[in-house]
Amino acid sequence: MKTFLIIGAASGQVPIIRKVKEMGHKTLVVSRAGPYPGLPEADLSLPIDVFDTSAIVSAAKEHKVSAVLTCQSELLLRVAASVAEELRLPGIPPSVLARIGDKATLREHCRLRGVETPKYWHVGSLSAFLDILRNVEESLVVKPVDNAGSKGVQFIPAPRNIDPCQAEKIYSESIQFSSLKQLIVEEFITGQEVVVEGAVLNGKVTPLMIGESWNIEFPGIFVPSRRFFPAAISDDAVRSIYEIDALIYHGLGEFFSVTQSEYIISARNGQIYLIDAHLRGGGACIESHIIPLVTGLDAQEKVVLSALGLRIDIPRSLTVRQHAGYVTFLLPRGRLLDALDPGGVEGIPGVHYHGLRGLTAGREIPESKNKSARFGPIVIHGDSRKDLYQTRDTLKATIKLRVETNRGICGPHWE
């Protein structure tokens, strides 16, 4: 039995904690104090700030850990990489994360490898930000270079016409989510969003599956409402996207990681643009639940084995066993009038797993600003894309939540 250090105890860490224990090992979780769902799952937990690398290293040495893991968070991934390097344990080298670990360095990495990204500007001051808005006509997206969970991402539909005070507010609200105090201002591309889950093993890239992504149409934020696998796009488009994905991750070094890349196929000219890339598996249960459902590959088992430095193999090609994906929803700001019975959701045919907890009458729903405001995910599966839509429609008909808002009684936003 080995001891695994897990950094973080939020819901995204629960599947990997369970997987480590299922494989016969012990878990040591470090996290700030709080009602985090990973804490009761752990064999042992310590109240350590997840960004206090030196304290984490000291605890790891004291408890003689054999492996370091974290899931679904770029910010914690950097911490895990630094801790593993300090302890001389397997992991992604910090030097690799420095190349593609934030949105600015990722775009430079893509430029050097011939991967198309939307036109962008890298800014670190209000004056530079305002200068861009004065000189650009196209719609723009503002992104902190090192944010997480879409925090600080904002849309500007008409940059030249924006009021200077509003522009300054957008800058301030976005820059607060960057520890580097830097932003990416990017041309807004309309089209079909596509997501690729892959694996990189010692510099070789293997695509695992490809899906489509749709956002909830909610004012001012970019939040995926659902992601369905496999994608209903042409074989030529799939091949092109897989070739681009290989360019991004090929030859980065001797390590293993599940990867996730987000693309958009332009509605204007069919050009494929990279939007984001991650040296981690997809959140919202993609790595833990959806990859195994679609492909039969237990991705998190590979993650656990590689963290111990053990040899792993990734099949060069995987067949689609079934369709699967997740759906989520947002609730408007206000007071929740109804309670949701989780058992009623679990009993719906096609529902594999859901993360709906705490939806009780009287709960105050705050303003939705980023991905963390979503309710779910609800993982669904079936023999076809039609089955997924049927299950989604049943969920919408079942989850009849009412919220008392300043505009009257409103329900969930699914689309």
Write out the residue ranges for each language-model feature:
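Glycine-rich active-site loop/lid that clamps phosphate-bearing ligands
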Residues: 329-360
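Short, conserved charged micro-motifs
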Residues: 55, 161-167, 334-340, 384-391
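Internal nucleotide-binding/catalytic subdomain
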Residues: 153-272, 281
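ATP-binding N-terminal substructure of ATP-dependent carboxylate-amine bond-forming enzymes
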Residues: 1-96, 127, 310-313, 322, ...
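Glycine-rich phosphate-binding loop signature in dinucleotide/nucleotide-binding domains
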Residues: 59-65, 134-136, 177-179
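A conserved helix-loop-beta module that forms one wall/lid of the active-site cleft
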Residues: 85-152, 157
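Short beta-strand-to-loop capping motifs
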Residues: 156-158, 198, 329-332, 378-384
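Active-site "cap" helix and flanking loop/linker of ATP-utilizing ligase/carboxylase catalytic domains
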Residues: 239-260, 278-338
